[in-house]
Regions:
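Short, glycine-/Ser/Thr-/acidic-enriched flexible segments
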Residues: 48-50, 85, 93
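Hydrophobic alpha-helical segments
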Residues: 13, 17, 66-69, 87, ...
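C-terminal helix/juxtamembrane-tail motif
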Residues: 138-155
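Conserved cytochrome P450 K-helix/beta-meander segment immediately N-terminal to the heme-binding cysteine loop
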Residues: 38, 44-72, 80
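Short conserved micro-motifs at the rims of enzyme active sites and ligand-binding pockets
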Residues: 22, 53-57, 74-76, 89-93
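Conserved cytochrome P450 K-helix E-x-x-R motif and the immediately C-terminal K′/meander segment
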Residues: 1-34
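Cytochrome P450 heme-binding "Cys pocket" and the immediately downstream C-terminal segment
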Residues: 90-143
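Hydrophobic, well-ordered secondary-structure elements that form the walls
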Residues: 10, 39, 63, 83, ...
Length: 155
């Protein structure tokens, strides 16, 4: 289950979008005492929220797959949204958060963990003849090109 914990921690630190936007359905006051009127657009800083030391501890900005979160906090933070705005594919992608008594043989790891596991089992490694390249058309750090070599399966 360590690989799944690595996937969750990576998703927390590197959400697919750094922000989320929601429109207020009623007047409210934020924790910062800022008033928000009905219909106003509110921007949620996912990068900041996912690094909140009150929730993720003093090393919140660091990669730590052994991180423990309080009940009610997900190990991947707000990266998949929350409530009615939660990503419909969250469980398919990230799987079910393991519990102490989870059976590794029938645990639902999620497709990201299963794909990463298959790549590791096949010896996936960077292709030294074709170095990876970042996508320069976006401000976010995304790979545009990352060729790998796989070992030939033994029959």
């Amino acid at each position: 289950m360590l690989l799944q914990r690595c996937v969750h921690e990576s998703a927390r630190l590197h959400p697919s979008s750094p922000v989320a936007r929601r429109r207020a359905e009623c007047p409210l006051t934020l924790a910062t005492d800022e008033a928000v009127e009905r219909g106003e657009l509110v921007t949620i800083d996912l990068l900041g929220a996912n690094r909140d030391e009150k929730i993720f501890g003093p090393d919140a900005a660091q990669f730590n797959p052994y991180r423990q979160t309080d009940k009610g906090s997900s190990p991947y933070g707000l990266s998949f949204g929350l409530g009615m705005h939660a990503c419909i594919g969250r469980t398919l992608a990230a799987g079910v958060t393991p519990k102490p008594d989870s059976n590794p043989l029938d645990h639902q790891y999620g497709t990201i963990t299963l794909i990463a596991s298959a790549l590791l089992e096949h010896g996936a490694r960077p292709d030294p003849a074709k170095p990876p390249k970042m996508d320069e058309k976006t401000e976010r750090p995304n790979w545009g090109y990352y060729p790998v070599i796989l070992d030939t399966p033994q029959s």
